[in-house]
Amino acid sequence: MSSESIAAKRRGVGGGIAFVVCGPSGAGKNSAIERVMAILPGLSFSVSYTTRARRSGEVDGRDYRYVSRQTFDELVAQGEMVEHVTYLGDAYGTPRAQIREVFSRGEDVVLNIDVKGAKRLKSCGLLDFAVIYVFLTPSSLEILGQRLRERGTETPEQIRGRLEVTRQEMEALPLFDYLVINDDLDTAVDELRAIIVAERSRVRRD
């Protein structure tokens, strides 16, 4: 049996896999995801829609798709979002069509969404693809707060708000399949890569 037919059988058993990576702002999710995608073939990043303002250095279509609230609400009404949430006044959503397109190429998809989005995705019931939930975070709120201050993109009040949200999000850990501690990026990348490799090798999903 060729490697191509073996891969096809794996797809037939479980189809594409959506790897949902959640965690607080400043946890290093983007950096870890980018590193893993540079190592592992067959992964595509799902670019979310958002109504929030673009930050310095961000690129439309790479980091997010930046749209008005009216456009976002129209996409939701048309059923174009797999999940969508509002976080600190800004809306975020995962486009359904992009996931379908990635799977049609025989690849797996990585989603960087918040805990509310993960909960909504999990509450959808039976999906036509497998979803693996990973929570990535530093080992303490003190480390997270320091990273947010060093990033310099938010006011002290906004940072306090994010830390409070993180405290609440930690209560949702039992909903996740894996926890990755990112105090050292190299270690976190190795762990995230190992998770993806293991899940791709899984024959049965209960």
What are these language model-derived features?
Residues 18-20:
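Short hydrophobic/aromatic beta-strand immediately N-terminal to the Walker A/P-loop
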Residues 27:
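ATP-binding Walker
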Residues 41, 127-132, 174-176:
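Short glycine-/polar-rich loops that comprise or flank the Walker A/P-loop
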Residues 2-8, 153-154, 168-206:
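NTP-dependent small-molecule kinase module
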Residues 30-80:
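N-terminal phosphate/diphosphate-binding loop that engages ATP/GTP or pyrophosphate donors
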Residues 8-16:
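Phosphate-binding P-loop
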Residues 22-24:
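P-loop (Walker A) phosphate-binding loop of NTP-binding proteins
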Residues 71-80, 94-151, 196:
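ATP-dependent NMP and nucleoside kinases share a basic, alpha-helical "lid"
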